[in-house]
Curated annotation (Swiss-Prot):
The keyword Heme does not apply. Residues 22-32 are annotated as: Important for interaction with STRA6. This is Retinol-binding protein 1. Pfam families: Lipocalin (PF00061). Cytoplasmic retinol-binding protein. Accepts retinol from the transport protein STRA6, and thereby contributes to retinol uptake, storage and retinoid homeostasis. The gene is RBP1.
Amino acid sequence: MPVDFTGYWKMLANENFEEYLRALDVNVALRKIANLLKPDKEIVQEGDHMIIRTLSTFRNYIMDFQVGKEFEEDLTGIDDRKCMTTVSWDGDKLECVQKGEKEGRGWTQWIEGDELHLEMRVEGVVCKQVFKKVN
């Protein structure tokens, strides 16, 4: 059975985030603001149905999906694009592929101990985030 990501997670590290946003063509003002934020993640998982809430003082983003089923993801407020997204299990990791204007876009998420690791990719740029479980 896949790992359970359910919980509330506080950000510990956010490596190469501004470069990731630059690769998404996010304007410089938004990149500077976003780079100062330390968003939390609230994840609810019921089987293969997941809701991932990314919460910050500036903007919130909610991703609600069924693992293994492609859906249209509206990234308004991030880079204002839409893409066709599929999230799949790869062992105990979640692998996301986001098909759209940008090449090689997606992310991988996994748990090590009480830490949630998120590696986001676009056009060869990689951002690594680490969160600590608080409940």
